Amino acid sequence: MTTFLAGGTGTPKLLAGARRVFDPAETTVVGNTGDDVALGGLLVCPDLDTVLFEGGGVLDRETWWGIADDGSTTHDYLTDLAAAADIDPDTPRYLPDDAQTAGRDIARWRRFSAASEFMFIGDRDRAVHTLRAGLLDEGHTLTEVTRRLADAFDLSVDLVPMSNDPVATIVQTPDGEQHFQTFWVAEHGDPTVEDVEFRGGERATAAQPAIEAIRDGPVVVGPSNPVTSIGPMLALDGIADALRDAQVVAVSPFVEDEVFSGPAAKLMAAVGHDPSTAGVADAYDFADAFVLDTADSTDLDRPVVRTDTSLDTEADAERVARACRDALVAASGEVT
């Protein structure tokens, strides 16, 4: 059994080549749900969906978001209709506080009006969110729904969410708080970040399949954003402890102090970690070994395997996955 902690695009890119290194039938992927949004009643789970679509062979690999060649009929008409009604279609309309804790529990603190569809949702992509919302409304847990969707996409790995409870990543800025999707999609990551909150994390329970998969490890933490992709998982009671009991290798999303992509540097600094590979190692005190880029000379107190950590192709991903396997061997002290 091998377990991957997945969020954003870093770990899904790694998974694209990992299937040649780690047996998919013996692989579990635990997906971050802190980025999820309820948009017009639909539950959008970006990090789960990227794994679903990649494993199902339909992912838009240009954006690593949504379904390739998806239609935009509903999104376009909704945008035009909103504009005609004098509604700015690009400005998120976060629902009032009392609405954030009403209705479906899993959507707490992440509810947006569909009057402004600030995130592009394709027609087939929308069907996935519609089915997910419908099954949740029937009383199924997010774990159950995710596994049914994984079956529908014929995934070869077991995909489970980190929790069946709501945890929302909230970014604190000088102008007030924003859901992470407002910060990243609508504001393009421009606002100054003062802190990051994982709202609901102190009350949420980690999904049992996620805990079991981590305990059964070893665990691979891909080059995802340590704050917004992995942080929500660490906020859950039980996951950090399970990681400390497991054998864990982490791939740094930095080359020394240069991040590969995304807002990780800004967010790391905001939560008190140095935006660098050294800062990632401090944040991941549970990790037994690291995979670093060959250009990264950071000296760590744990075993390190170096390789080219770029993930532009499946061959790249396979190379990094093999480095992860080598790092796990190094951490265990086994001789190969």
Curated annotation (Swiss-Prot):
Pfam families: CofD. One of its GO terms (molecular function) is LPPG:FO 2-phospho-L-lactate transferase activity. SUPFAM superfamilies: CofD-like. It comes from the Archaea. Its EC number is 2.7.8.28. Keywords: Magnesium, Transferase. Pathway: Cofactor biosynthesis; coenzyme F420 biosynthesis. Belongs to the CofD family. Homodimer. HAMAP family: CofD (MF_01257). Catalyzes the transfer of the 2-phospholactate moiety from (2S)-lactyl-2-diphospho-5'-guanosine to 7,8-didemethyl-8-hydroxy-5-deazariboflavin (FO) with the formation of oxidized coenzyme F420-0 and GMP. This is 2-phospho-L-lactate transferase. It comes from Halobacterium salinarum (strain ATCC 700922 / JCM 11081 / NRC-1) (Halobacterium halobium). The gene is cofD.
